[in-house]
Amino acid sequence: MEEKGSKMVEQGNQDAPAPPETMAQPFPSAQFAPPQNGIPAEYTPSHPHPTPDYSGQTPVAEHTLNLYTPAQTHSEPSGPDNSIQAVSGTATQTDDSAQTDSQQQTQSSEITEIKTQPKRLHVSNIPFRFRDPDLRQMFGQFGKILDVEIIFNERGSKGFGFVTFESSADADRAREKLHGTVVEGRKIEVNNATARVMTNKKTVNPYANGWKLNPVVGAVYSPEFYAVPGFPYPAATAAAAAYRGAHLRGRGRTVYNTFRAAAPPPHIPAYGGVVYQDGFYGADIYGGYTAYRYTQPATATAAAYSDSYGRVYAADPYNHALAPAATYSVGAMNAFAPLTDAKTRSHADDVGLVLSSLQASIYRGGYSRFAPY
């Protein structure tokens, strides 16, 4: 029995293994062309497709390559991108840190320079008996002092001064400690000294003719330089030029001789009377130019006078008229006012008023108490 059993085992082992079940092979579908012109064509059966072999491992390997090949292709460029991004991020962080360090160094250097620069303090309300050593002793405890200055005038100390420290930090510390302290009953004030801005302000002249005084007052006090456009006495211009060009001692008498030698202006009929206020003689009324010391030519014309303005004659026909008047004093010419209203007064009245004041100033100039001779 044992032999039979062994034989059976051997026979069982000798049997060929059963072939694996094969998959159903697909049958190729016959492809028929459409009939042309109703004539049936002979069709040969097409060759069947080769049966694919599914038993081997080659298809699995092929599928493996097909599955992982695109993954490897996509994974290859990702490495350099990540490395580039990492490097660029590191470089950006490095640049930012370098800029921050440079800014901090610059700021620290600027702060150091500011602290080491000299600084000037303005000290006000200090005692009047204080002198430079006293102020230096007061501020010297806070640092090295370069300069101390107390402002004086002809009567003594003005109560304020300046202290210059070598270091700005010492100056700030002294200002914080000493500002508001009481010294000898006076509360001193310590502030940073600032430079005074000097601006050249041009004064606006209210008069178009260049005079700061009004024309009437200017004609009374300085007739030799009273020359404005339209003024009907051009001799003043020539006289002013002669006065500026001549080297004279004391009062320029030649100026007044030029005025006396020049022919007087014509009479203006529209000019009314003038009231001169005199404290000694009361109110004296003088009409026009007739009561003046100059005689008025009756037949002269304006053209003739325009040709003779500024002409110096050999004789001085009006020299005898410079004696003091018998009816009024020199002080009577100081204050005067026209009788006519300012609204109804014409331009001729104003011109006559200026001319009268001009002649009055010439009269007074001959007896000026400021003349040295």
From Swiss-Prot:
Residues 119-195 form the RRM domain. The gene is rbfox1. Its main location: nucleus. Disulfide bonds: none annotated. The record marks 120, 128-129, 153, 158, 162, 186, 196 as: Interaction with RNA. It is found in: Nucleus; Cytoplasm. RNA-binding protein that regulates alternative splicing events by binding to 5'-UGCAUGU-3' elements. Regulates alternative splicing of tissue-specific exons. It comes from Danio rerio. Keywords: Cytoplasm, mRNA processing, mRNA splicing, Nucleus, RNA-binding. This is RNA binding protein fox-1 homolog 1. Residues 66-89 have a biased composition (Polar residues).
